[in-house]
From Swiss-Prot:
PANTHER family linked: PROTEIN YCEI (PTHR34406:SF1)
SUPFAM superfamilies: YceI-like
Protein name listed in UniProt: UPF0312 protein SAS2572
Classification via InterPro entries: Lipid/polyisoprenoid-bd_YceI, TTHA0802/YceI-like_sf
SMART domains in the record: YceI
Gene3D superfamilies for this protein: Lipid/polyisoprenoid-binding, YceI-like (2.40.128.110)
Pfam families per record: YceI (PF04264)
Similarity comment: family membership: Belongs to the UPF0312 family.
Amino acid sequence: MTNFTFDGAHSSLEFQIKHLMVSKVKGSFDQFDVAVEGDINDFSTLKATATIIPSSINTKNEARDNHLKSGDFFGTDEFDKITFVTKSVSESKVVGDLTIKGITNEETFDVEFNGVSKNPMDGSQVTGVIVTGTINRENYGINFNQALETGGVMLGKDVKFEASAEFSISE
């Protein structure tokens, strides 16, 4: 069994969504945690739970962030966390239940496992993964949108994300 300690200072969770049919808006969740258990040498034994604090959303625009925290989007007064609980893990895919605003759907995401390294600062063993994927926000009750005079809508329904997580590990 491998002991995993999440390193939030060396991890990130970023997303992007199409805006006005012509560009992308990017942002991040600044507070999240990932708990992992299992044997790093046997991916089939790995189980993980990611917990994201949606009120930590950061798009570098306070007014937009406040709107994203409202009931039009994440409803952070009522729904204080987003969770992803794995069902299966391989070296290239992770399948699990994603819950946003109390709505749970099974999702499959891509995984890039980056091996194990020794941290020269303290001698600890570290590992990292990058998880990428796309979710349809409307599947989670995030339906806010506005029609554009030129056709199309203000916001795309697909949200792309990249989560980079680093862990100290020990046996």
